[in-house]
Amino acid sequence: MPSFGTLLSLSTLALLIAVVYQNPEPLIRPITGSIAFKIIQQLFEHTHCYVTVKTNSVDLPYAECFSVANGKFKRVFLDETSYDVVKDLRKGHVLPGLWDGHGHLMQLGELMDSVNLFGAGSMDEVQKRLVQYKALRQEAGTSEQWLRGVGWDQANFEGKWPVAKDLEINDKFKDLYVMLDRVDVHCIWVSDKVLSLLPNPTPEVPGGEIPADGVLCDNAIDLVMKYYPKPSNERRTKFIREAMFELNKLGIVGIHDAGVYPAELVLYQELSKNESWTVRVNAMVECEARNTFCPDDVANISTPDGRLHVQSVKLFADGALGSWGSAMIEPYSDKSSSGSLLVDAETLTKLTHKWAKAGYQVNIHAIGDLANRLAIDAFEEALKVLCPDSTLRECQSKYRFRIEHAQIIHPDDQRRMHELGIIPSIQPTHATSDMSYAESRLGKQRIAEEAYRMRSLLRLNPVFGSDFPVEPANIFEGIYAAVTRRSPRTGLDAGGGTNGWYPSETVTLEDALDGFTINPAYAAFLEGKAGVIEAGAYADWIVLDEPIETLDMEALRKLTVKETWVGGEMVYRRTGPVPLPWIKN
């Protein structure tokens, strides 16, 4: 057995080598260039080789091998002969790890523990799913743990809003606390038991609407949330871990978490220290009171390993299109309403400036064209004050203001976005999910000129996401929707054809991949660290059975990931038979 002195000497040598290896300054480069050092260096590296490696790097777009140490890529090269020892030879085709540019981590985990109402085509189907869920969850519906669900759509109820009485399915349901989120999570549908908690008469809420007894939308939701029993940290931890596993399964290594409360950030910071934290999170702060300034409740966070990043805030300009809540310049085509703003223009501008001055990137939820106009106004005014001695475009490159959804934008405001360089955060599957009703709601002209822009905004390097759990957290479905403008569920457009819905707004496969890799990295101040396979970047990658660029587009609808790696560690491996994707001839 080696003596204590020998072990101490070896430990000291190893530490010295590690320091030299991590700090190759000019004075010690002769050491790092020696054959002996290269041999020792391999002890700290692990090398992986695949059939192809798509890197997203300008210097070397495609490679075959890379080495990893301390959670980062160290070298990327074409073949194993350019390196002395190959430590891991694998089959498969590699892409940089995928990022979802707009999702909701906690809500995804909570949905996985709730009633899934997506696709429920009738009131009977909703009630059937609630009864089935309750039979398995006796604790659901108590005052301590409400029965939760998400995914209903009044369009499936013959266009009529549901009411609280619809939730009294049988005698067992009459005394239950039930809260169900609409498909866009901008409205809730609650039981009479929940309504009994509210003041009588129910007060009017600026920026909120109560379209039916038991349905509350946008700011009116806050009336109920005062009484909602928040899940314990134990349950929240369960939500997060289950959601992260689901995301890893889909090849997702990082997300922009679009609205995290201060109390949740405390839990995030604690959990991010553990190995079970397998998704990088760029979190947007959302104050407990929406559209306020709460810097004392949060702090900028950037963990050394890059697992948690907090440097942005989320504000809300309007609601959602599906519930007529998005704020429009002109009234809807199918309703004598223009939607509603959740905040006035002056407050939005002041909040933007205050948050930016406090060191936070500002991301504004805006769907309607009026909301998008006010968001652009707020950004422009803030930039003028923040950088009086530089151009607005230069200032924007520093602060990187974003519009979340950027769904309906007047042509004049599209030009302003390009002039300022405002980053659009787009969800391609929103276009294909909304196409069945969007034209009747907005009219053909607004759809053709303003709505669901993708190709029109490419010069702004748009961030792509899914808005999970509103849409499935499947990036390949998002890529399919962006490239084809067809539903990833059916493969068809709004008319039942295959031409695509307003196909002039399609993007290329390469553009779509950028939207889920390098563009989210830039929008999170992580360029060179995420969305790319090159020296110094986080060692995050996914493995597919075939190169994605060789696949027929229809294969994307069923594509699955073979492996997902985060920080050089495998966090997901597919089991079972390998699916056979359709390959181009």
Report the location of each language-model feature.
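Beta-rich accessory regions
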Residues: G567-E569, T575-P577
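Acidic (Asp/Glu)-rich catalytic clusters
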Residues: L271-E275, V298-L308, M417-G421
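Short glycine-rich, flexible loops that bind phosphorylated cofactors or substrates
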Residues: N156, L197, T432-S433, L551
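Short, solvent-exposed loop/beta-turn-alpha elements that line the ligand-binding surface or hinge
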Residues: M553, R574
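His/Asp/Glu-enriched, well-ordered alpha-helical/loop segment
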Residues: K238, H353-N363, L370-F401, H405-A406, ...
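Short loop/helix-cap segments at secondary-structure boundaries that form the rim of catalytic
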Residues: F77-Y83, I301, R415-M417
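Divalent metal-binding segments
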Residues: P2-D296, Q311, L315-A371, C395, ...
